[in-house]
Amino acid sequence: MKRVKYKKPRIGLYSTGLEAYWAQFPGLRERLLTYNCFIESNLAKSCDVSNFGLVDTVQKARKAGDWFTEQKVDIIFVHAATYATSATVLPVHQHCSAKVILLNLQPSPQLNYDETNTAEWLANCGACPVPEFANALHRANISYDVINGLLGLSETPVDTKSDENTSHMPEAQKAWKTINEWIQAARIKSNLQQATFGFLGNTYSGMLDLYSDFTMLQAQTGIHIEVLEMCDLQALQDYVTTSDVAEIEQITQDMFNIAEDSPSEKLAKKPSKEQLAKAYNVAATQQKLVEERGLDALAYYYHGAPGNAYEQLQSDFILGHSLLTANGISCAGEGDLKTAVAMKVCDTIGVGGSFCEIVVTDYKEGTILFGHDGPFHIDIAEGKPALRGMGVYHGKQGSGISVEAKVKTGPITLLYLTQTVEGRLKWIISEAESTDGRIMTIGNTQTPVKFSLHPDEYFDALFKEAPTHHCAMAIGHNASVFTKMAKLMGTEYKVI
């Protein structure tokens, strides 16, 4: 199965100007359009750009708004190129509801005061109209954000009187980092709105934090939820071929170590040939289900009468769902749809998203271990994950193969998706460090995590936010992207 390819977001761009300037200052309009093209070329590295060019009249503003709507843009970057009246900006956003980001990117860090004329100044006065734009947008009840800094050209254009080579300067680098974070946030939102999430089986009985209204989830994230039954999966087993199974076996051998018996847990042993064969078959079946139903993610769990055929089938889920997760089909156990969404968010921007919960606190090391009995995101593993044969899944029916692994050492982000008393989704975001600490050999994923807070202080802050008990673990510090994503989606968030 090939890895999921995510679509690029579509970003709108236009530059502001005052029509009266063009006759007064020949060449100014062309110079500002050069800056506009520079911004477009930078944006195009990570998104599809719909560039309207220069907006300098009310009529063009209305036309631009309609055009951006036709283009279905996720964000509109408003390049404040020079002074312009707010009357030539507000109509754009009254005609198109996409998120507004004002770009105040000055070309030069300092004017050549002795040689600067009015045209030179006007090419650098992008900050001048931003308060006016902000006031008009606010009074029209249109939300906006502003990015301030330097434009970031790598060389000074000919006939320019001030030095505009600013790509090396922190004010340019910070501005473009923020711009790219908004693009990543738009990538998340646009892909979620096109995603189909499977819900297979049911939610673990009694885990009240996991229960959420399917309609609410679609309304607030844009995902479509396909309700699936275990018989939908079982029916596909008849179509699994020996070559399908052989392919899964080869992938598994490449990705995993087959662990020996655990030295500490008698229930965690080296997987038997029979256990592996069953897991390979079920993994091939799971891939067929994903392909047949066009799934982008999956929440799953099954609990039925002891010893029935579906129980045997679900006992072998973890390997296949770990392989799917590595290919961009985020899979969350225990029927946790909200955490499946959080995992998908992480995978969309290439930072993993592994299914986790609190495992135990190591007070001597100052860490909290996070993990689960699976599935695991293999792409972000520290070394090769191990497969163990489990005599029992704690708290669940059945037995089979589980994954023992840890997330690679370095910066990580935990992303929780919970639900408030008002029925609104809420993100809880924590940046931390994955350490090279010890873990148990019990056939579960575990990662020792050190926060800037003492473990008890972190728990104090986390538990006050009423989280779900699962979360997605991603590599890298991604809070700035996830907060922007929450703003785009209109959902609450809290950074701890």
What are these model-predicted stretches?
Residues 396-496:
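Extended hydrophobic packing segments that form well-structured cores
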Residues 61-73, 90-94, 283-292:
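Short, well-structured alpha-helical segments in soluble
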Residues 91-117, 121-132, 320-334:
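Short, acidic/small-residue loops that bind anionic groups at enzyme active sites
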Residues 322-441:
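C-terminal catalytic subdomain
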Residues 246-340, 348:
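Long, internal scaffold/assembly segments composed of regular secondary structure
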